[in-house]
Regions:
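Interface-prone segments of viral and bacterial extracellular assemblies
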Residues: 1-171
Length: 171
């Protein structure tokens, strides 16, 4: 699956029409590819934290999205990665609704986020999560945001997803 379900260790409360920026630890994986000229085929993905590797289902059992699931802690800044296990991702949370909201998770396609490394440290492209109304339903638009860094960018050979939204079962 290309989707990641990050469950925060602390709930983030956003009052109406407010925003917050947080840093979270995000699990990393190593991809093994077969490369023949311009043809690239992924053979396997190996998680760097095999003891905590889980999958979760976002949505109903019959139509939900299978996700790589991780319970993540808040990081202090972009350099707070756990060497060879977890990188750091910046998430900007915007609440454009007329009421306060609590955010405890985010689901997104990881193929939209590049990974950068320097020695044993890792950072990932960030996310912008916008809580808003679409007709009568509250949704969370999730978009990838490139990080500005001089760290080495890891090669990317997977397809990307244009945009995503999740219904507000935000809890």
């Amino acid at each position: 699956t290309n989707y990641v379900f990050l469950k925060f260790d602390k709930e983030i409360y956003l009052s109406s029409n407010s925003a917050a920026s947080i840093f979270v630890h995000c699990p990393i994986e190593i991809g093994i590819f077969l490369i023949n000229g311009s043809d690239r085929e992924s053979l396997d993905w190996i998680t760097c934290d095999s003891l905590n590797s889980r999958f979760g289902l976002y949505g109903s059992p019959d139509t939900g999205t299978l996700c790589k699931y991780a319970e993540v802690t808040l990081a202090t800044d972009m350099t707070d990665s756990i060497p060879y296990v977890e990188g750091v991702m910046k998430i900007i949370l915007e609440n454009n609704l007329d009421s306060g909201q609590t955010v405890s998770k985010v689901i997104f396609p990881i193929t939209d986020n590049s990974l950068y490394y320097e020695n044993s440290k890792v950072i990932l492209d960030g996310l912008r999560v916008t809580l808003r109304k679409r007709a009568v339903v509250s949704i969370a638009d999730v978009k990838s945001e490139s990080v500005d860094t001089d760290w080495t960018k890891s090669p990317t050979w997977e397809d990307t997803t244009a945009s995503t939204s999740m219904e507000m079962g935000l809890e």
